[in-house]
Amino acid sequence: RPEWCVKILNGEKTVEIRKNRPKLKPPFKCYIYCTKAQKKLITIFRDGDVFGDGEVYRGKPQFVTWDGGDIPIEIRQKEQTVIAEFVCDKIRPIIGKTWIVKEDIERATSGSCLSLKQIIEYAGWSHCSSFTERKELYAWHISDLKIYDQPKSLSGFSRHDFRGMNGTDVCGNE
């Protein structure tokens, strides 16, 4: 998401918390794809609605949305592109079954820009009736960040050896 991209690019976010990890052993290269900002519905204008100044709206329903507005323009212009790469030089497992002390989790996730509450919510730990039901999380360490001068289109990334079921390098989901 764009708000996380801002934090990674400015060096504030140095740890990515994930529910999974690749089979690769660190170090390995990762690419940062900046998604489009999520829009939030503010209101819907419907035919016959009266505005505060007494004006009456006429027409089809109009959805009024807001995308946060606090994302810098330089990131907005790079949405839906690959904007950087980094090397994940270590992955620290966060084992929910054994992590009982709040300070231990905070230390393991330091640099993630997430609160303990956000981590617990993301992991789904708040719904667990016991520690043994908690799933693992993984703290991916971000190092050797390289920010692209020009963002790259996702279409420029492919596995050269990939051959789909139809014998081509295209998945057919266009």
Residue ranges of predicted features:
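Structured alpha/beta reader/binder surfaces that contact nucleic acids or chromatin modification marks
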Residues: R1-E174
